[in-house]
Amino acid sequence: MQDQYILALDQGTTSSRAMLFDRQGNIVSIAQKEFEQIYPQPGWVEHDPQEIWSTQAGVAAEAVTRTGLNGTSIAAIGITNQRETTIVWDRETGQPVYNAIVWQDRRTADFCDSLKKQGLEAKVRAKTGLPIDSYFSATKIRWILDNVPGARDKARQGKLAFGTVDSWLVWNFTKHELHVTDVTNASRTMLFNIHTREWDSELLELLDIPRSMLPEVKASSEIYGHTKTTVFASKIPLAGIAGDQHAALFGQMCTTSGMVKNTYGTGCFLMMNTGDKPIESKNNLVTTIAWQIGDDVQYALEGSIFIAGAVVQWLRDGVGLIKTAAEIEALAASVPHTDGVYLVPAFAGLGAPHWNARARGSVFGVTRGTSAAHLARAALDAIAYQSLDVLAAMEADSGISIGELRVDGGASANDLLMQFQADLLGVDAVRPQITETTALGAAYLAGLAIGYWKNLDEVRDQWQLDRRFAPSMPKEQVEQRMAGWQRAVRAAKAWADDTQ
């Protein structure tokens, strides 16, 4: 197996990416292609499933050929993907019956409210670890069955297949032979019992979704099958699947209970490994399966923040405060603090642990002396404050004191933000050398399945530090800042509450 590589496919919300990794976990090649976002109505977000497939197949081939390699150089393929996004297709023709309904899509919000009014939230959470929300796949499937002509009849006849993006890619890579998913993607559908690790008959009945539509659920690291497409002439093992945040947790080597990662992207996704037992959240977090390797299943607590790096994009595109996103660090660093200014970026409501859909973006504490630099600093600080809210909820739910925070994603390159995050948290923020942790996690899962890497210890040893940010702010100062933030969040919620 000399000079073989692992190909990681990272199918994201705005682009399809492919990366080749060598035995040391280094990136050898990378290819990326963006695709169209479709907005048919306000609050609706769709993708073309055929474009998801064509862009992903295209970058897979490009990542391999641009290094002068071919399919025989690929030891295995690992897949990681945007989660919850829902595709339903005809088993006979292989054609989607409707566009992919993306995780951000809110069209089923009213239906979710009606399920909550029936008192079903506790039951759904107990079985799936998830709240009832249009974010997850179940109500999106139901919408397609109810609204696409002929879909329900075909589904009853066993002619339709449902899959999250991983299933759709495997189906196409195997020329319509394999209809599978892994436990992490299944655990985001609101149809999967995370305790029995099976599709839940009661929930399927409740939502009137035929079981015949659903993929077979597998571990996150095993040989599912081999490629049969013209993308690669050789048959390559498809050997790893995990949803993007789960793959990032694995790529960060958060493999023991209590380890936490934060991916700083457009939003923030925080995940804590809670070991082999699911913890039901009392603090508005989501309980999910982290991954499964062999018979070993790890669980996690997760909190999502809607607006993180997006607040910087807003300052650039919406307000014109900066010309490029990279400018924000220098501008924010030109003042020692925000001078009492707080920015609550609730542009789309507040995510975990607040889950307030009606809160709106607000700026507090503005005086005549407030400058562009203060606003820039308040925007960065808001990312760290929101992350701390989620981390505090994780500590409360798990009873575990966080020892360090492993960070990745685009905004983790911002040293000022990482330092403030460490200051607030009171523990080190730790940035790895390879911040492409999502793709790396998928590569590791695939490589472990075929013996490319011997065991978990071997890949754990590859994790390398780029920089460790140690807390340096006095405790009283942290408490004072946090009190101001909490006041600002309360005010942002009150603004949206028209009963006050």
From Swiss-Prot:
EC number, as in UniProt: 2.7.1.30
Reaction catalysis annotation: glycerol + ATP = sn-glycerol 3-phosphate + ADP + H(+)
Keywords from the UniProt entry: ATP-binding, Glycerol metabolism, Kinase, Nucleotide-binding, Transferase
Coiled coil segments of this chain: none
Residues holding glycerol: 83-84, 135, 244-245
Protein name: Glycerol kinase
Source organism superkingdom: Bacteria
Organism annotation: Burkholderia cenocepacia (strain HI2424)
Function: Key enzyme in the regulation of glycerol uptake and metabolism. Catalyzes the phosphorylation of glycerol to yield sn-glycerol 3-phosphate.
Protein residues bound to ATP: 13-15, 266, 309, 313, 410
Source taxonomy: Bacteria, Pseudomonadati, Pseudomonadota, Betaproteobacteria, Burkholderiales
Top-level class of the enzyme under EC nomenclature: transferase
Activity control mechanisms: Inhibited by fructose 1,6-bisphosphate (FBP).
Family note: Belongs to the FGGY kinase family.
Pathway listed: Polyol metabolism; glycerol degradation via glycerol kinase pathway; sn-glycerol 3-phosphate from glycerol: step 1/1
HAMAP family in the record: Glycerol_kin (MF_00186)
Alphabetical list of SUPFAM superfamilies matching this protein: Actin-like ATPase domain (SSF53067)
Binding of ADP, residues: 13, 17, 266, 309, 410, 414
GO molecular function terms listed in the Swiss-Prot or TrEMBL record: ATP binding; glycerol kinase activity
Keyword presence, ATP-binding: yes
